């Protein structure tokens, strides 16, 4: 299963773009983009939006990958990770139904 970093790298390479070219459009150092692609650093939400535009990726799908990576990395080492996800899903449904904002 590809991470958001792998998705970005695969798409960038398929378009024949260099790290420095994409990094320049993002206004970040190419070393940072390289770390994002290698999953050594997490992109910001703003980076995800810009990357989707630069690489012509579906913004919503890339955002789903970004958010799911964040959650997965946060709870992966927990013994109760699956239970946490099930309860979190119920909480999200509740919050959406009751229009609760954080």
Where in the sequence are the language-model features?
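The alpha-helix within a helix-turn-helix
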Residues: 12, 23, 52
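DNA major-groove recognition helix of helix-turn-helix/homeodomain DNA-binding modules
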Residues: 27, 44-61
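Short, charged recognition helix plus adjacent turn
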Residues: 63-102
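A short, Lys/Arg-rich alpha-helix, primarily the initiator
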Residues: 1-14
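Helix-turn-helix DNA-binding elements, focusing on the entry/boundary residues of the two helices
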Residues: 8, 19, 30, 45-48
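Short alpha-helical DNA-recognition segment
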Residues: 16-34
